[in-house]
C-alpha cells in the first residue's frame, strides 16, 4: 500500500541508495551502513568503501577513522592498519578530554584486534583490559566486541573458564550486535580458528 517492506535486505538496499545518491543523507547513510556491516551483519568487506569515503571526506572525524580502521583490520590489511593506528595515536592528542575519555577505549580495542590478528593473544588481552575498564561510550557494541575478543583470546590460550566469563559478559549486554550470537556459539564450543 505505502511501498513498505520490512525486510532487512530492503532496508539495507534503501540505505545504500541514500549513501550513493543522497545530497546530504549520504554521510549518515554511509555511517549507518559501516556500523551495520562491521558489527551487526559481520560483513567487514562491505564496510571498507563506505568507511574509506567517510575518512576521505572527513579526515579529522575520529569516529569515522575508527570505523575505517576496524574495516582494515577485519579485512586483513594488517600493515596498513598498523600505520593507521600510528596516525590515530597522533590524532587523539587533539581531542577534548571528554572525546579522549570516549574514544581512547575504542582505539585500544582496535589495537587489541590487530594484536589478535597477529596471534599475540596476551598482548590483545592487555589492551582489552584497558578498553573494558575505561569504556564510557553510550553505544555498547564495541564493548560487546571487546568482551567477545577477550573470550576468544582466552580460548586461544586454553583458559576456558575466563573465556566463558567473557562470553557471558558479552551476552549480558543484550545489544543487537553480531557479537552476541558469536558469544553464544563460543560458550558451547571454544573458539579455535
State each model region's role.
Residues 24-26, 59, 102, 141, ...:
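Residue signature of alpha-solenoid helical repeat architecture, marking inter-repeat boundaries
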Residues 5, 40-41, 75, 118, ...:
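Structural motif corresponding to the intra-repeat A-B loop/turn of tetratricopeptide repeats
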Residues 12-20, 52-56, 86-96, 129-136, ...:
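Amphipathic alpha-helical segments of tetratricopeptide repeats
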Amino acid at each position: 500500500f505505502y511501498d513498505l517492506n520490512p525486510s532487512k535486505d530492503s532496508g539495507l538496499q534503501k540505505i545504500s541508495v541514500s549513501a550513493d545518491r543522497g545530497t546530504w543523507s549520504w554521510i549518515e547513510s554511509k555511517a549507518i551502513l559501516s556500523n551495520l556491516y562491521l558489527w551487526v551483519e559481520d560483513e567487514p568487506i562491505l564496510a571498507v568503501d563506505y568507511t574509506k569515503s567517510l575518512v576521505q571526506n572527513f579526515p579529522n572525524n575520529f569516529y569515522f577513522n575508527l570505523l575505517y580502521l576496524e574495516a582494515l583490520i577485519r579485512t586483513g590489511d594488517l600493515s596498513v592498519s598498523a600505520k593507521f593506528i600510528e596516525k590515530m595515536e597522533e590524532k587523539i592528542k587533539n581531542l577534548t578530554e571528554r572525546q579522549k575519555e570516549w574514544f581512547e577505549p575504542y582505539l585500544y580495542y582496535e589495537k587489541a584486534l590487530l594484536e589478535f590478528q597477529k596471534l599475540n593473544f596476551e598482548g590483545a588481552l592487555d589492551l582489552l583490559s584497558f578498553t573494558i575498564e575505561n569504556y564510557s561510550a553510550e553505544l555498547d557494541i564495541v564493548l560487546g566486541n571487546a568482551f567477545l575478543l577477550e573470550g576468544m583470546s582466552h580460548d586461544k590460550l586454553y583458559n576456558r573458564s575466563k573465556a566463558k566469563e567473557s562470553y557471558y559478559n558479552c551476552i549480558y549486554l543484550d545489544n543487537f550486535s553480531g557479537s552476541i550470537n558469536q558469544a553464544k556459539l563460543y560458550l558451547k564450543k571454544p573458539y579455535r580458528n
